């Protein structure tokens, strides 16, 4: 869960560079179990972000099996945030997608 929040925070850094008038939309590709977690977290984050920046943000979700979701991203699904629950799926994102450093497990134990 901490990794999920860290990834979401990373995506937010990218939002800071968005033009003030732009509507920002994030796509979070996640595994099924997190559906209820984000159902509660996303509205709280949208409010927090609006209060802090004055900007609107919309969060879209894509849920599925972790391995299926990882494969979708490697195959071209343009995710802003990726939350996986299996280390082999994160390894796939590193090896085939180049989306995370190969040493991610040492950097984020």
Predicted features along the sequence, with ranges:
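Bacterial N-terminal signal peptides
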Residues: 5-16
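Sec/Tat signal peptide C-region and signal peptidase I cleavage site
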Residues: 18-22
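N-terminal segment of the mature folded domain
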Residues: 23-109
């Amino acid at each position: 869960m901490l990794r999920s929040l860290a990834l979401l925070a990373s995506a937010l850094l990218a939002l800071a560079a968005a033009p003030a008038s732009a509507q920002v939309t994030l796509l979070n590709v996640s595994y099924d179990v997190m559906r209820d977690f984000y159902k509660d977290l996303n509205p709280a984050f949208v409010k927090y972000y609006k209060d802090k920046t004055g900007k609107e943000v919309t969060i879209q979700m894509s849920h599925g099996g972790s391995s299926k979701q990882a494969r979708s991203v490697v195959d071209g699904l343009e995710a802003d945030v990726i939350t996986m629950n299996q280390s082999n799926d994160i390894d796939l994102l590193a090896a085939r997608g180049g989306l995370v450093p190969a040493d991610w497990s040492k950097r984020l134990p």
